[in-house]
Amino acid sequence: MQILVTGGTGFIGRSLCTRLLAEGHDPIVLTRRPGRNPQPGVRSVAALDEVGPVQAVVNLAGEPLMDGRWTDERKQALRDSRIGTTQALLAWMVGLPERPRVLVSGSAIGWYGPRDSAPLDETASPGHDFAAMLCRHWEAEALKAEDLGVRTCVLRTGIVLEREGGALQKMLPPFRMGLGGPMGDGRQWMSWIHREDLVGMILWLLTRDQARGAYNGTAPGTVTNRTFATTLGEVLHRPARLTTPAFALKLGFGEMSGLLLTGQNVQPAHALAEGFVFQYPSLEGALQAIVGAPDR
């Protein structure tokens, strides 16, 4: 398939494009800087009118949630990069003589808002904080593609784990020095997924004709923040007992600290029920694969 990828130069998008090429697909990346960090075999375009016919769209565009305090200006940038990009994709699809067969659009488990320990599947109610409202509006725009005859899946992604990006990249330096540990009381849930499993789930949704609607992009082995810190310390053979106080996170990150001090126990119910198989269902196995080997 010819597949348009927004956010294709990012932490998840580049890995996805590599996998698409390996499986014989033709990824086309929409980016503001087509000449920056090119991937061999991947065509980059700066505007939608340069794309040409595609059979699928993967919409991963979005400014990182954790890069900077949530000022009013920052919040607007987060909205524009997600909701605005999705609206532009829908407007582009309307004018196409032949529309894509499928759209897989990003979202996040922030859709559920801060929750207690009760497991959440895709039928759970949404939250009402900023992150939840951002995800709700983002998904609502993407699902309008169904009205155009485009099979649409929204992927509510958890904490994506790999060593060269995302949350784990920021965590590794202090943990390797023995300075890691839980955040706040450590009881908040962390719903995570290995990047290889997330990329695999995107391909699975692209090619599975029955798939549509919301899917949780999380591994089944959710853990508390304290367990995550302990497990990472064990894999690295380092102590992980240095707690970061909640007040320090609130002081440093403001409203955004809620993403660190609260969580959700999100389960991939739809993916499991429909036959998706995780390579890394447990946290220890995922972390061993990422940072446990001697050469990593």
Residue map of PLM features:
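N-terminal Rossmann NAD(P)H-binding glycine-rich loop of SDR-like oxidoreductase domains
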Residues: 3-23
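NAD(P)H-binding glycine-rich loop region in Rossmannoid oxidoreductase-like domains
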Residues: 35-88
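Conserved Rossmann-fold NAD(P)-dependent oxidoreductase catalytic core, especially the SDR/UDP-sugar
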Residues: 87-129
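Conserved beta-loop-beta element that borders a ligand/cofactor-binding pocket
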Residues: 107, 140-163
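Glycine/proline-rich active-site loop of Rossmann-fold NAD(P)-dependent oxidoreductases
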Residues: 136, 148-150, 161-170, 205-215
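Alpha-helical substrate-binding/gating segment
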Residues: 172-180, 188-222
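Mid/C-terminal beta-alpha module of Rossmann-like enzyme folds, strongest
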Residues: 208-255, 288-296
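C-terminal amphipathic/interface module of NAD(P)-dependent oxidoreductases
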Residues: 258-296
